[in-house]
């Protein structure tokens, strides 16, 4: 089921649980572009400043509780383009490195 929620920090934007980002004022879905590693990013404006943010981080911050205050997000199915909430999990940096090492041998 598709759901849109306001991002907790970037309050001018709605985040879809599947990985789309929409400007609340214009209603337009923002275009993304990929960084050097192939992860989608988007430019967000807040208080007159523009910041480039990874889409997976916006989805995780909006939809996935983070009671342990981890700062790293892992793509469960190893597809960096699948930014759906069910494919993301918070973890610590060292755990994410273990996942990445394991991925090299899959």
Where are these predicted regions, by residue range?
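Conserved recognition-core residues within compact binding domains
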Residues: 1-73, 77-106
């Amino acid at each position: 089921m598709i759901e849109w929620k306001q991002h907790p920090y970037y309050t001018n934007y709605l985040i879809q649980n599947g990985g789309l980002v929409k400007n609340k004022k214009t209603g337009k879905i923002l275009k993304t572009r990929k960084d050097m590693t192939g992860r989608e990013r988007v430019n967000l404006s807040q208080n007159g400043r523009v910041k480039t943010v990874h889409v997976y981080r916006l989805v995780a911050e909006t939809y996935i509780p983070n009671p342990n205050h981890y700062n790293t997000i892992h793509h469960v199915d190893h597809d960096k383009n699948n930014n759906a909430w069910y494919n993301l999990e918070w973890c610590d940096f060292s755990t994410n490195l273990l996942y990445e090492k394991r991925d090299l041998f899959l």
